[in-house]
UniProtKB/Swiss-Prot annotation:
GO terms for cellular component: outer membrane-bounded periplasmic space. It is found in: Periplasm. Gene3D superfamilies: Bacterial extracellular solute-binding protein, family 7. This is Solute-binding protein SPO1773. One of its GO terms (molecular function) is carbohydrate binding.
Amino acid sequence: MTISFKGLARGVACAALVLAALPAAAKEFRLGLITPPPHTWTKAAEAFGAELSEKSGGAHSVSVFPARQLGNEAQMLQQLQTGALDMAFMTVAEVSNRVPNMGAFYAPYLAGDINHAAAILRSDTARGMLAVLPQEAGVVGVGFGSAGMRQILSRGAVNSAADLSGLKLRITPFDPILDFYNALGAAPTPMPLPAVYDALANGQVDAIDMDVELINVLKYHEHADTILISNHMMFPMVGLISARVYAGMSDADKAMISELMAKHVDSTLDVYMVKEPEWTDALTKVGKTFKRVDQSFFGDAIAQWETIWADKAPSLPELRKTAADLQ
């Protein structure tokens, strides 16, 4: 068989054109969350994946794994660090377990309401706190979102903070909220979301720290007597990319993926600003005792928290100043 030089050259040229048309690093990314499929964060993750596929011409896609399918947040953060997981929408709570300065976001009454919380999370001060994540946690933070403000749901009556003393109270497992409830004399009990409904129903816990979205959507109020709207803490989320995975991206992909993820993470703030008043109003109609309280309700527990976290979270004074400026 004889192959002419011209024929070979044409074949090489055609192959080169085909290869040039292919993306340099087409990939299906895996993104993990702890939230269930109907949750705002999960919907934002799915929207991010859809837009990334569109903007990359189908080169990139995102498979979303909600509801702890890839493990709890501590496990997913470890997977991000090794590169076994590409991306996550994760509570800042879990990140603060590795980077204590992030605990500043959980200062009691740092934000007055969800609108104020959104403004704080969109500030230069907040975004600047992401810079250390590659070095300290092995992840790249692209921006903040949020869940709703924290409230308290109790199986029994709560007329004062003293009524929380000794109660087994479900929390997300991280130090800032643990310290807050310890200061109140409660018995904070870490527990994953899937276990909360049954734990309330059978009395395994007496109360829970939760936001109004999940109190509504997962119907936690069905096994409670008192809904305490306290807005005592914000509960931010951060969009994360494995630093190992990020390092292997082209500059163009780094820019596109970071921008799109930041956009959809940020969109959760807009959702909560609209929906949180609606979810709160819905809880006034479920036939439970409904109370609104402010920071005076918690007595000196807030000052105790500040004493503990003053050294752990050096960004706290600047973040409080930013919060005051944005009121």
